[in-house]
Amino acid sequence: MTTVAIIGAGPGLGLATARRFGREGFSVALISRTQAHVDSLASTLGAEGVTARGYAANVRDAQALRQALDTAVVDLGPIEVLQYSPVPAREFMKPVLETTAEDLAGPVEQSVYGPAVAVQYVLPGLQQLGRGTVLFINGASAVTPNGNVAGTSVAFAGESAYGQMLHDALAPEGIHVAQLIIPRGIGGGEPDHEPEALAERIFTLHRDRGRFRTVVGEESA
């Protein structure tokens, strides 16, 4: 049995993705900042027959993130799928002319350093398995910079570049790296933006592989 690790797990997309992979027999590692939060999600999944455990870690704390992933592997088995989808903090989303150099540290730590820590941890295991998927979930500012959310735009651009390079480098090894762009956020009355529909799209990216970037709502997606 292998594991899907969801970093930034919440009651919307994270829980829906966990359910979708759980139906395929994956164990689920739920990682977020608050232990009680992920324990509640794990309990919900457990009642539905999904093997799930919660682990507390702030993605801006490299040691804590590595420890959470390490414990998940011990508890649940090797990680085959990594989803990186923490929600940006409100303070990351200031207008560009109000954003200082210091303001960029947090977004970059979350969206560039955090993914690098997680990928570098899981990559040896994926290479040993000879397969696997790394999934980056981002908003529209990862594609088109938005001056109203400068920190996130800068950091998501770095995350996108890192993901694209990983996609190109790891494809020959049978490891797929993909990015799902969700414009306008999750929900909002749009059927293809609902958590369950997005979770299905995420599972399809893992199953079918292909190109790096998919944008929800695009006809070619």
Predicted region positions:
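Active-site Tyr-X3-Lys motif and surrounding loop/helix of classical short-chain dehydrogenase/reductase
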Residues: 67-74, 94-98, 102-110
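Hydrophobic positions on the long internal alpha-helix
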Residues: 68, 83, 114-122
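A glycine-rich helix->loop->beta "capping" turn
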Residues: 48-51, 71-84, 207-211
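C-terminal helical subdomain
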Residues: 160-164, 172-221
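Conserved glycine-rich cofactor-binding loop
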Residues: 10-11
